[in-house]
Amino acid sequence: MRIALKSKRTISIIFSIVIALSISPNAFAVTPHETNIQIHQPIYDKIEAAILSILPEKEHYGLNDLNISELSLGQYIPSFEIVNNKLVPLDLYFYPIFDGENKVVSMAAITTVNGDTIVSISTAFVEQLQSIMPNCKVSIVYDSDGPYLLTQHTMIKLADYPMNMDFGRSNITAVNSSELQQANGVSLLGTKPLTPDLQIRPLGEDDDSIYLAVPKVLQPTGSSICWAACVASTVNYKYYGPGSAVYTAQDIADMYGYNTALGCAQVINTMNALFSNMQYTNNGGNNNNFPNIWSSLSSKDSPVIGRFEYSTGGGHFMVIRGMNYYGTFSVMDPLEAGATYRSGTITGTGNTRNFSIISYTGGSTLTLTHYGYKY
């Protein structure tokens, strides 16, 4: 069954301008632990553009029936990592998104990769943020085991890393409490309304975005079988339809006979052997990703199984299940339990482009390196 959300090829003048904006890396330059700053307009514009791109399925990003004019953006929540037993600021900024009652409903993450601005929208960590009083100052700290939400009084574990991954970080217990107090946070208050110009100007009759409602399948906590969760989600969607939960990640791992990390070729080839109706093509690298992924989603009603590389090293599989022709894509991440889907940014030109997305759990950027798709 095909359940896809599409929108006609329409785009506003302001949206085109927003997408075309470039952001200087200096826009992110702040002194360590500085939090009381204005939201830079180019950053605001990029986040606004990312929100506009997910409007056709906003319910998956915590926005539900909210009108975008009701939303506001808060000061960024600073993030840190523990490296060599020291607290070090991360070039990764989380902007909470608030509804009209000043409740956190979603969150934007933003960073730069090779001079390109990367924005992701997700509901990851939102449930924990909603439990924090507005006057509490919060920050996010990544150690060797996972991310933590820090306030003046509490430390909440947000997620766990995959097996055998520590992202080169030390354990938070190695840092004394006085140093952790330097991770100055911000209060959870909406400070800048989101006021995009939603007037649109038709450019044609073709569709400009496609989203497949693939089932959410999680990998077991602490495991490295993200690939199995992606196969389960894809097979469930193709064989049984949206929302189906016939196969789990562990079911697929048992069928493959592996409970360890695998390469993309083995994942795709074995899936084809086990499920004769799949017959996916494994791309040996990352070439021609833009037209191939677009075609697989829009023409073949087939999610793409993508192998991404962390900026800190190591790989992770996610299902590419949506794409907007003007620079965003959407994934099902089996590692993040707090979100159904997450958006990423497409940069570059031509047939081979950069598909980059921020890992809220890993505090790192993921970039597509291999993929399996329906030809």
Which residues does each PLM region occupy?
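Conserved active-site-adjacent core of cysteine acyl-enzyme catalytic domains
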Residues: 33-105, 113-125, 249-375
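Primarily single-stranded nucleic-acid-binding OB-fold modules
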Residues: 117-142
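Active-site-adjacent structural segments surrounding the nucleophilic cysteine of cysteine proteases
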Residues: 132-134, 153-261, 312, 343-344
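Sec-dependent signal peptide cleavage junction
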Residues: 21-35
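Bacterial N-terminal signal peptides
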Residues: 13-22
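Short beta-strand elements that form the blades of beta-propeller/WD-repeat-like
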Residues: 91-99, 139-141, 146-151
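Bacterial N-terminal signal peptides that target proteins for export
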Residues: 3-14
